[in-house]
Curated annotation (Swiss-Prot):
GO MF annotation terms: sodium channel inhibitor activity; toxin activity
Tissue distribution of the protein: Expressed by the venom gland.
Domain text: Has the structural arrangement of an alpha-helix connected to antiparallel beta-sheets by disulfide bonds (CS-alpha/beta).
Name of protein: Toxin Acra III-1
Chief location: secreted
Cellular-component GO terms for this entry: extracellular region
Disulfide bonds: C18-C41, C27-C46, C31-C48
Record domain LCN-type CS-alpha/beta: where: 4-67
Gene3D superfamilies hit by this protein: Knottin, scorpion toxin-like (3.30.30.10)
């Protein structure tokens, strides 16, 4: 069965390019920033499993998941 997910977008609205297909540490980090625990390189772009529409764009993901108290003094 296919696992749902999405290609996350960076600050410019582009997908994250990757060269090492499959297991990819860069993509895993990117997916964690976008609020999900796992992703990999597929068709030369990072794919994040279970990435919801609301977190595809990096700015939305940061707003939804950031816990930086300097950016968000009241916490998130």
């Amino acid at each position: 069965a296919d696992v749902p997910g999405n290609y996350p977008l960076d600050t410019r609205g582009y997908s994250y390019y990757c060269t090492k297909l499959g297991e990819n540490e860069f993509c895993k980090k990117i997916c964690k920033i976008h609020g999900v625990s796992y992703g990999y390189c597929y068709n030369s772009y990072c794919w994040c499993e279970y990435l919801e529409g609301k977190d595809i764009n990096i700015w939305d993901a940061v707003k939804n998941h950031c816990t930086n108290t300097n950016l968000y003094p009241n916490g998130k």
